[in-house]
């Protein structure tokens, strides 16, 4: 157990956020066959964040998004990935990284994710975008390039995820 997981468990209990596996397991079972990252984000937004009352979304922040996504994904994919939050590298800190475990079919699969959280007042503007902001693309591509330099045999994929309060989400592979 880490302090982060203890905090998230406490937060979920305090706010009666349901951790019922039936909300999540089908998506993670499907991930085993298609390895598509976007449905993980969709499931997180709809099934986890969807339980929160609207007023919470003006109080949470990017750190909460990053930590709660980590807590959920690591619960169901820790048999095939290791996870890092705020992973240090030569160009900064990536928000979230999942690295395939040696000896599994996931070995050399690396996903680098940059999360951006927007409150209600900015949500519609961000949801109208057809592509992520250039500075976010440059940021996550820098993290991915650094990982690729360190681990040249890895297949590194990078993503930008916008969580726009309780109004919606966007996920791009860049």
Could you say what each language-model-derived stretch is?
Residues 128-174:
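Nucleic-acid nuclease catalytic cores
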Residues 1-126, 131-136, 144:
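Extended alpha-helical interface modules used as scaffolds for assembling large macromolecular complexes
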């Amino acid at each position: 157990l880490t302090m982060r997981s203890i905090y998230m468990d406490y937060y979920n209990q305090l706010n009666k956020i349901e951790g019922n596996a039936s909300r999540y397991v089908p998506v993670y079972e499907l991930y085993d066959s298609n390895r598509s990252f976007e449905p993980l984000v969709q499931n997180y937004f709809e099934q986890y964040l969807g339980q929160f009352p609207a007023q919470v979304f003006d109080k949470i922040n990017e750190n909460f998004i990053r930590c709660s996504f980590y807590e959920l994904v690591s619960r169901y994919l820790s048999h095939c990935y290791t996870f890092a939050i705020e992973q240090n590298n030569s160009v900064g800190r990536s928000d979230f990284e999942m690295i395939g475990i040696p000896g599994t079919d996931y070995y050399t699969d690396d996903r680098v994710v940059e999360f951006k959280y927007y409150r209600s007042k900015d949500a519609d503007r961000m949801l109208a975008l057809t592509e992520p902001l250039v500075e976010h693309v440059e940021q996550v591509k820098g993290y991915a390039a650094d990982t690729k330099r360190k681990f040249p045999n890895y297949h590194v994929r990078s993503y930008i995820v916008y969580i726009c309060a309780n109004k919606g989400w966007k996920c791009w592979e860049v």
